[in-house]
Amino acid sequence: MADAEAAMTFPKKHKKKKERKPLPEADVAEIQHAEDFLIKPESKAAQLDTSQWPLLLKNFDRLNVRTTHYTPIPCGSNPLKREIGEYVRTGFINLDKPSNPSSHEVVAWIRRILRVEKTGHSGTLDPKVTGCLIVCIERATRLVKSQQSAGKEYVGVVRLHNAIEGTAQLSRALETLTGALFQRPPLIAAVKRQLRVRTIYESRVVEYDPERRLGVFWVSCEAGTYIRTLCVHLGLLLGVGGQMQELRRVRSGVVGERDHMVTMHDVLDAQYLYDHHRDESYLRRVVFPLEKLLTSHKRLVMKDSAVNAICYGAKIMLPGLLRYEDGIEVNQEVVVITTKGEAVCVAIALMTTAVISTCDHGVVAKIKRVIMERDTYPRKWGLGPKASQKKQLIKQGLLDKHGRPTDGTPASWTRDYVDYSDSSKKATAAEATPGPGVTADAASIVKRKRDSDSDADEATPTTTPRVKKEKKKKKEKADGGEEAAEDGDGDATRKKKKKKARAAEELSG
């Protein structure tokens, strides 16, 4: 049996190795001599495809470049790569608000679920209204004001009290209610019922059911528009009367119902998974970075060294600018970002794109709202020549700890240094430098004239209208008193005369 098994064994198949043809040494040498292995200089840099980059860095290669030189600082991080605690505290939720609870209740529940200190929303929805409610968390609440004033879109159902001709008539009536409209809040409203003007940008009829007299419509409008009032006006315009049956908000600002809208259950599940399984992926899908709300703004990219100064309220100056967008207009709202794509602040532009490209100094924008936390980036101000000299003098004891001059302060420092935080020194500096085209003699003459005018004013005190009125009243009162006294004396003499006449008659009688 064993012999049979031995006979049954099959021979092992050996894999054939692929034969490699060795390259002759001469050929390698020839290739090395023939080809130039170097990075060749080019007239233009290769194009980066940044169309798929996230949030505020999208298409950043299309921004105008003021300078490409800056010193990167290893602080901060890309908004999508923040540590989970920081990510939640600087994020927002595009929530599908359920029917029946009020907006404030929903926001309070979210705060309790995520265990954060502060939450806010993008505009109140009535209890029965559903749809897009942007819930901002902690740092993102700084953007609530701008989100509340952003445009909104709704889909509503209107019930008409009587039959109409058809969809065309409803469509014409809805088209009439476009543009600036007078509105008074409904009877049951949380605000004062004052007449107000609100703008309807666009509207259209989606569907009309003549049997049930129900019409579905879509409307894009200004923040604070009452769709309930719009439905009442629509009924009046059609001559049959109408009321709002149902309403859903489909867009709030730049975020719509198709942009990763989540429910309250999703938020609860995401927090549960993180608490019990340390799985933060679901939480990152529910919460989005606040930078997503600012993607419609024009961008200004700042150097890393200028970021913390802006967080402390410094002006946005041109030397700290790296890149800027096309089409910036004066008084337009812009967003200031870092090189990593983090939002630093929302600002009001003071220069147009054309002016920024031609100037080398000046204030580019003024801060409207700082978003980033202070000291996320290190302090980089106070490193200039004057500031360094001041620090040295404080160290040597020639200035006090606040930088104020002492007895041992060098005369050159007190003469040359201007402390712009001291208002008295500002005034003296302004007086010392008269305006262009005005000589010192002319300035002194003007000053002398002012002094003489003030002396004259002191010599002749002016009486105010109030004092004059009081004097007039006193005079009238005094005159009235004298007249009354005179009248009283006359009455007394008359009475005496009458008494004398009666006494004489009695004696004669």
From Swiss-Prot:
GO biological process: box H/ACA sno(s)RNA 3'-end processing; box H/ACA sno(s)RNA metabolic process; enzyme-directed rRNA pseudouridine synthesis; mRNA pseudouridine synthesis; positive regulation of cell population proliferation; positive regulation of telomerase RNA localization to Cajal body; positive regulation of telomere maintenance via telomerase; regulation of telomerase RNA localization to Cajal body
Segments for region (Nucleolar localization): 2-22
Modified residues (Phosphothreonine): 460
Comp. bias regions, Basic residues: 11-20, 466-475
Domain PUA: 297-372
Phosphoserine: residues bearing it: 388, 452, 454, 508
InterPro entries associated with the record: Dyskerin-like (IPR012960), PsdUridine_synth_cat_dom_sf (IPR020103), PsdUridine_synth_N (IPR002501), PUA (IPR002478), PUA-like_sf (IPR015947), PUA_sf (IPR036974), tRNA_PsdUridine_synth_B_fam (IPR004802), TruB_C (IPR032819)
Biased composition (Acidic residues): 481-490
UniProt region (Disordered), positions on chain: 1-25, 381-509
Entry EC no(s): 5.4.99.-
Subcellular localization(s) per the UniProt record: Nucleus, Nucleolus; Nucleus, Cajal body
Primary location group: nucleus
Active site: 126
Any one GO molecular function term: telomerase RNA binding
Superkingdom of origin organism: Eukaryota
Catalysed reactions, as listed in the record: uridine in 5S rRNA = pseudouridine in 5S rRNA
Keywords carried by this UniProt record: Acetylation, Isomerase, Isopeptide bond, Nucleus, Phosphoprotein, Ribonucleoprotein, Ribosome biogenesis, RNA-binding, rRNA processing, Ubl conjugation
GO cellular component terms, A-Z: box H/ACA snoRNP complex; box H/ACA telomerase RNP complex; Cajal body; nucleolus; nucleoplasm; telomerase holoenzyme complex
Compositional bias segments (type: Basic and acidic residues): 416-425
UniProt subunit comment: Part of the H/ACA small nucleolar ribonucleoprotein (H/ACA snoRNP) complex, which contains NHP2/NOLA2, GAR1/NOLA1, NOP10/NOLA3, and DKC1/NOLA4, which is presumed to be the catalytic subunit. The complex contains a stable core formed by binding of one or two NOP10-DKC1 heterodimers to NHP2; GAR1 subsequently binds to this core via DKC1. The complex binds a box H/ACA small nucleolar RNA (snoRNA), which may target the specific site of modification within the RNA substrate. During assembly, the complex contains NAF1 instead of GAR1/NOLA1.
Stated name of the protein: H/ACA ribonucleoprotein complex subunit DKC1
